[in-house]
Amino acid sequence: MKNKKQTLLIFSLICNLILLFLIFPVNRARIRILFFSIMGYSSGNVPNFRDTLLVTEFKPKSQYKQTHSNKDIPSFPVIESHGHLGLFFKTNPAQVSKALDDLNIEYFINLNTRGGKDFLDIKKEYNDKRILHFTSFRWDYIKEADGVSKILATLKSDFEAGARGVKLWKNFGLELKKPNGERLRLDDEILEPIFQEIERQEKIVSIHTADPEAFFYPIDETNERYEELIRHPEWSFNSEVFPKFQEIMEEREKMFKKYPKIKFVSLHFGEFAHRLEDADRLLTTNPNVSIDIAARIDELGRHPIQTREFFTKWQDRILFGMDGPPEKEKLSIYVRFLETQDEYFDYYPVNKPRKGIWKIYGLGLSTPILKKIYYENTKILLKL
């Protein structure tokens, strides 16, 4: 009996040592190579490799020999319909004006996210006539009993000071609360006086609603934007604290229909760059809505055939935008996406992080469509 226990103990120890040995990938590799070497299918050489690799460290260099058209500057003048300036974006007026000259940007729409003094200050600082400034609602008033009246008064003042339109950010619909503590819905009736004033003054509303749908899902191995979300966990809306993605989209639809005389620009392709059938429905059912491509060519370039068909169908309702200051590196990627048929290239500049592990394909749009997207559609919308 004693010998039997000793035998089992030794056997168990050997098994555990084998398992411990096999835990390490390099040891498993040695066994495989030894096996195939004995079979005559391997030289027996054990290559050097890292046992583990973080997804953020995985930056493969493709062996695919890419064709590069070397098309970096747009073929036509550009109106940047979704630009940002100021301290957060590390810009200065002289630098921006020079970039507009160098990059053939005819007008630059600066979408401010605050109204009142902040709007007046940046408008005064960036006074190049090619820069058109949008204001925003003073949401810091919204929890006050007379907050809507204060927002309306500030908005009127900003319009008198030259604001060409209104920018609404994603906190509207996701986070903002009314005085009673309830979430402020996109189609909330308490905002009617404000939107009625926008309609009366015939101003444009550029609205950023929600974020990519992946931001509403768990940050785990199934999320293709995992790398982006672990870098920016504050962008995650996968919580009961926030409404669901579809709920916000439905509220936005009601808002668009509630104010049919207001011209809306649904920014970031309406957050439907990954679902073109929904983008098609959005434009079909809301003739007062346009969309821009800002910060969504990463999604659009993944399905170029469908995207090209969509751009052809809706060529009068798509605006050019890059979601930031005027930058040559970023512009060159947008130009490559819109104008060439290059394949399998990066959608981000070398000095910027990627959103997910994929590449994009160019659309090779025709000259008439390019002109509309680059500048004609925005000129019509803003009556330039």
Predicted regions located by residue number:
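Alpha-helical scaffolding within the catalytic cores
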Residues: 62-67, 92-95, 115-123, 149-154, ...
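Histidine-centered divalent metal-coordination motifs
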Residues: 77-86, 208, 268
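Active-site gating/metal-coordination segments in enzymes
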Residues: 118-235, 287
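Mid-to-C-terminal alpha-helical segments outside catalytic/metal-binding sites
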Residues: 2-74, 98, 102, 106-107, ...
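Divalent metal-dependent hydrolysis catalytic cores, especially in the metallo-beta-lactamase
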Residues: 78-83, 95-117, 131-138, 164-165, ...
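H/E-rich (His + Asp/Glu) clusters that bind or coordinate divalent metals
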Residues: 89-90, 240, 246-254, 259-384
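Acidic-and-aromatic substrate-binding clefts and catalytic sites of carbohydrate-active enzymes
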Residues: 85-93, 108-118, 140-149, 176, ...
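Short, well-ordered coil/turn segments that N-cap beta-strands
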Residues: 74-79, 104-108, 127-134, 161-164, ...
